[in-house]
Design a protein with these regions (language model features):
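Active-site neighborhoods and metal-handling regions in enzymes and metal-associated proteins
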Residues: 1-199
């Protein structure tokens, strides 16, 4: 699946982007609280990325409750956080080499939903290695989320990351599938489990 043979310098840029992203994700999540502004959190995260030496790979996404993913506050957005389930999705690039992550912040009083997604991510990461099929990763995600009494969101998937490309093959499902693509050494992927208490 690797379109480009990544050399050591390119791997280092992916790693640097990931390190910046991990720090910004955690710091931005701490800013998500009832009454805080969606736009201010997004703008703060994007500026923090730049302070640390990266660039935003895409506008910060702040999605609420059943929205699940891909909502971005507009320039005039005055929305504030309430007692919500918040998905904060952030990307960083260093010279076009991307890292992409999300974190769920529970302001709703239902922490089990966020815990199910986090546990599914950890289980999936334990599965990833060269030669594993994406369907196997999906099966681990589904089994973990099911174990919490929730359902995986099946119309959203993880994905590959390329040079200046946010979504590349392979797709990484959030459920078991019979057909999958075998991961190769050098593939860079974002694994994105989503759990729901709906269908």
């Amino acid at each position: 699946m690797t379109d480009v043979d990544l050399d050591a310098e390119q791997y280092e840029k992916n790693r640097e982007a990931g390190e910046i992203l991990a720090q910004v994700r955690n710091e931005a999540a701490d800013r998500v609280e009832v009454g805080a502004s969606h736009l201010e959190v997004a703008e703060w995260a994007e500026e923090r990325i730049r302070e640390l030496g990266g660039e935003p790979a895409f506008p910060v996404n702040i999605s609420i409750d059943e929205e699940a993913a891909h909502a971005t506050p507009g320039v005039d957005d005055s929305t504030t956080f309430g007692e919500d389930m918040v998905n904060l999705d952030i990307g960083v690039h260093v010279d076009g080499w991307l890292a992409d992550t999300a974190v769920t912040v529970d302001l709703s009083g239902n922490p089990e939903l966020a815990e199910a997604s986090e546990a599914a991510l950890e289980a999936a990461l334990d599965t990833v290695e060269a030669g594993v099929e994406t369907g196997e990763i999906g099966a681990v995600i589904e089994e973990t989320i099911d174990g919490y009494g929730f359902n995986p969101v099946v119309n959203l998937t993880g994905h590959g990351l390329g040079h200046w490309q946010q979504h590349t093959p392979p797709n990484i499902p959030n459920r078991a599938v019979d057909q999958g693509i075998e991961l190769e050494a050098g593939d860079v992927v974002a694994i994105e489990p989503f759990a729901t208490d709906g269908g």
